[in-house]
Design a protein with these regions (language model features):
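Active-site beta-strand termini and strand-to-loop segments that position acidic
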Residues: 54-61, 81-83
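Short, solvent-exposed loop/turn elements at beta->coil junctions and helix N-caps
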Residues: 40-46, 69
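Active-site loop of classical SDR/Rossmann-like NAD(P)-dependent oxidoreductases
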Residues: 112-126, 142
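Short polybasic amphipathic segments
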Residues: 79-81, 96-105
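A general structural signal for well-ordered alpha-helical segments in protein cores
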Residues: 24-28, 51, 96-98, 121-129, ...
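Glycine-rich phosphate/pyrophosphate-binding beta-alpha loops
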Residues: 67-74
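Predominantly a Rossmann-like dinucleotide-binding segment in NAD(P)-dependent oxidoreductases
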Residues: 1-39
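C-terminal helix-rich "cap/oligomerization" subdomain common to oxidoreductases
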Residues: 59, 127-169
């Protein structure tokens, strides 16, 4: 299987963790905060992580089960939050404009927002530009602590699965 260099080159910290697993981990963090327990396993070959299974347990008792793979994306293009009153599903975590609520097999509601931009990074760029124009040194939307916390979670996952970024260490 041939991948883009940003994904397949260990010198660029390529692999699933920093390319796709970061999105559901960030989403779980933004919903429930920093987890009290992080458990993970992964598949590593030639210095590249091809996928991870991560379980984050939060103080409120909720658990996020995350699976991500750069080899087999079938079925992984969505994020699902399940609870006692049903489940919420959204297409890929980063640029979705639609959320589906399923109470049971008979009840389904679809909520649509404005269409995703062609490149959802434009939203992030616009937010940063606004912060700079306003003289803010930190984003209200994604404070430095949130970025640091997510990176710490990713680092814990990396260590648990035995992934090394030799060029960065």
């Amino acid at each position: 299987v041939k991948y883009a260099p940003r994904v397949s080159d260990p010198k660029r910290a390529g692999g699933a963790l920093l390319d796709i697993t970061i999105y559901p981990i960030t989403y779980a963090y933004r919903l429930w905060g920093y987890p009290v327990k992080i458990e993970s396993s992964g598949t590593i070959e030639n210095g590249i992580d091809y996928g991870e299974d991560v379980m984050l347990t939060f103080e409120n008792g909720l658990t996020a089960r995350i699976s991500a793979s750069i080899v087999d994306m079938k079925g992984l293009e969505k994020m699902t939050i399940s609870g006692e009153k049903g489940k919420i599903q959204a297409s890929f975590y980063h640029a979705t404009n639609q959320v589906t609520y399923k109470k049971n097999i008979f009840h389904k509601e679809v909520f649509k927002g404005p269409g995703p931009r062609i490149n959802s990074y434009l939203d992030e760029f616009d937010a940063v530009a606004e912060d700079i124009r306003a003289g803010r040194l930190e984003s209200k939307m994604v404070p430095l602590q949130a970025t640091s916390d997510v990176m710490h979670i990713l680092d814990r996952v990396r260590k648990q699965i035995g992934l090394e970024y030799t060029e960065l260490e």
